[in-house]
Structures are given as structure tokens and as C-alpha cells.
Amino acid sequence: MRGIILALLLAIAGSERTQIEPVFSESKTSVYNYEAVILNGFPESGLSRAGIKINCKVEISAYAQRSYFLK
């Protein structure tokens, strides 16, 4: 019985379709703001670490069918 239930659950999970490709509107421009910190060094106490902070703004606009312009 457990085997049948497991097989049914796996079949249901495997048949689910997800859309991986993002969909952007052709009439709108999507704007994303990213912020990241990159640290170098050892995580032990008493040792120095160096790092850099990155800020990024990305604009995505439709260029043609299934083609996009990133700025």
C-alpha cells in the first residue's frame, strides 16, 4: 500500500509543469535593484577580512518577440 501511495505521489509531482522562463510585458519596463556584499578572508575571530559592496540597477525592456533588452 505504501508503495502505491509513493508511486502516485511521484507521478503527480513529476507531471506538474512549471514555467521556468520569465514572462515580461512588452509595454512595460521592469526595474530590479540588487545589493550584494562580497567578503574575503577567514571566518576565524581575530583575523581581518576585506570586502566590497555592490549596488546594481537592471532595466529589462521588450525588444522583439521573445527578445529583451537589458540595461
From Swiss-Prot:
A GO molecular-function descriptor: lipid transporter activity
Vitellogenin domain: residues covered: 24-71
Keywords for this protein: Phosphoprotein, Signal, Storage protein
Induction: By steroids (estrogen).
Signal sequence residues: 1-15
Pfam family, one: Vitellogenin_N
Gene Ontology process terms (BP): cellular response to estrogen stimulus; response to estradiol
Tissues expressed in: Produced by the liver, secreted into the blood and then sequestered by receptor mediated endocytosis into growing oocytes, where it is generally cleaved, giving rise to the respective yolk components.
Keyword Phosphoprotein found: yes
Protein's job: Precursor of the major egg-yolk proteins that are sources of nutrients during early development of oviparous organisms.
Protein name: Vitellogenin-A1
Organism: Xenopus laevis
